[in-house]
Amino acid sequence: MKTTIKQAKDHLNQDVTIGAWLTNKRSSGKIAFLQLRDGTGFMQGVVVKSEVDEEVFKLAKEITQESSLYVTGTITEDNRSDLGYEMQVKSIEVISEAHDYPITPKNHGTEFLMDHRHLWLRSKKQHAVMKIRNEVIRATYEFFNKDGFTKVDPPILTASAPEGTSELFHTKYFDQDAFLSQSGQLYLEAAAMAHGKVFSFGPTFRAEKSKTRRHLIEFWMIEGEMAFTNHAESLEIQEQYVTHVVKSVLENCKLELKMLERDTSKLEKVATPFPRISYDDAIEFLKAEGFDDIEWGEDFGAPHETAIANHYDLPVFITNYPTKIKPFYMQPNPENEETVLCADLIAPEGYGEIIGGSERVDDLELLEQRVKEHGLDEEAYSYYLDLRRYGSVPHCGFGLGLERTVAWISGVEHVRETAPFPRLLNRLYP
């Protein structure tokens, strides 16, 4: 019977065949231990010399790392294994023998591993991170579908930019200029006026020459836009969404979190409501903590965000940033028009901002004024202004960076490990 490593638990004390790759092995004169993987998991195969043909044991000792195999044997309980079972191997069929696999069991430098990213993905740690990424995506669709959101796919090639000031990747669109999308927000706002609540999931591109552990040039973003929604209601949706994702990973990725040696007690504390601190209060807090390099009207850097998040040891919303450091489309704060109704969600443990969101300007005259103040081409934003001409309503939106969120949940140091093939400042291969 052919099965997978993950499904093998359903076949205790039965003979099965599994297609797998050999990740590592060790052997003595009488027994060989094969570390097997098949994409669904990792399992040990035990080959006992006295219980198999001589040719099988010889093959078990000689087979090379990352060779592909069909392995047949009996699934037996093993309490020492994370899975709780292993295979007593009876026969081995080599599908394809690997020679001189470059990523050997010894330690390798990061640049070497990134050069061989197509192979590094096979390792236990990288496999675990990708499984957690997959669960975050699955839980995302589950949350938005249950909450009545409609999935909308905004274009990747655009003629204008929602942020206005961010660096963009430029390309030619026949005889016109075009840019790779840095956000689907403006299109989602239009879709929200048709469907009420919408979300998107797709790649975004930022031509930022940053080398920090938090930044990728190409990253995936989950964005939501909600009509007839105010800022406070939007924050509630955001914290419910993040909490749902964290709980889903804790429930469905126990083995992966254990593989990564993640301290899950920190994730288990994540629950609504998240703490909130205004930008003004955050400035005062940082001053009291000895940060003399930040003044009112300046954006926070990584050390500032980390200090604030560490104070709460939970995801925390920083609200109501100064108008002058935020994009043109954010609604003024009625209590202080030098600030806007926005929030950044800062992840704990130094992972930084994972969500940015705001209430959107819904008044046509004010939005036209903002477009001019930011030096934007009004014609390029005419469709966006139309949304305020024809039945404008209060509405909000937010965007969550997938890779940063996965980095935080999985506990990996750098976001490059959370994308299958990360695009970094000096890396476009493989």
UniProtKB/Swiss-Prot annotation:
Subcellular location as annotated: Cytoplasm
EC numbers, comma separated: 6.1.1.22
A Pfam family that the UniProt record links to this protein: tRNA-synt_2
Keywords attached to this entry: Aminoacyl-tRNA synthetase, ATP-binding, Cytoplasm, Ligase, Nucleotide-binding, Protein biosynthesis
Chief place where the protein resides: cytoplasm
Matches recorded under HAMAP family: Asn_tRNA_synth
Protein name: Asparagine--tRNA ligase
Organism for this UniProt entry: Staphylococcus aureus (strain MRSA252)
Highest classification ranks of the organism: Bacteria, Bacillati, Bacillota, Bacilli, Bacillales
